[in-house]
Amino acid sequence: RIRKAMHGVPVETKLPDRAYRPEVSDRVYREMAWRADLILSEGGSVVADAVFDRPADHDRIEKAASDRGVTFAGFWLEADPLVLWQRVSERRGGPSDATVDILSRQLQRNATPPAWRKVDADRKLADIAAELASVSDAAAFAQRASLKTAS
């Protein structure tokens, strides 16, 4: 949604390829990290939903959390490539501009951030959400425990 806002269009509007050039993506991910830092500075929680397939991007979002002294829980959702291709090719409407060509390029990069938890996304949405919530709850508990120990 940040990219669409930067281009002044509604989220359902398909952007041209030039909107996905590396320098534009760099601005998008910097803005996302800046927003995350702002929210964390006010004591809020952040969910940053993006591809994060470039090391600079996932390093930047992790740094936003570490600079604020909060626990970071990064998740890398994976599914069988055939399932992903089917999902993308059947998608109609919505904010995503992804195509099967874009998906193919992303899969070739094989850019899983090393410290992020891999999550099998080839399951029911409820099962994925439950796994993410349990890990997030554990991270929040660890964060509270470390704050109590430090004080």
Annotated model-derived regions:
Residues 1-44:
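Conserved substrate/cofactor phosphate-moiety recognition/catalytic segment
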Residues 1-2, 52-53, 78-85, 123-125:
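Conserved nucleotide-binding/hydrolysis micro-motifs of P-loop NTPases
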Residues 10-15, 65, 91-95:
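Short, hinge-like loop/turn segments at secondary-structure boundaries
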Residues 21-29, 57, 84, 99-103, ...:
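Helical mechanochemical/support elements of P-loop NTPase systems and associated helical scaffolds
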Residues 42-46, 71-73:
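Loop/turn-to-beta-strand initiation segments
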Residues 52-53, 61-65:
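Conserved P-loop NTPase nucleotide-binding/switch module
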Residues 68-88:
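Conserved phosphate-donor/acceptor-positioning beta-strand/loop module used by diverse small-molecule
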Residues 90-151:
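Small-molecule kinase domains that catalyze NTP-dependent phosphoryl transfer to phosphate-bearing small molecules
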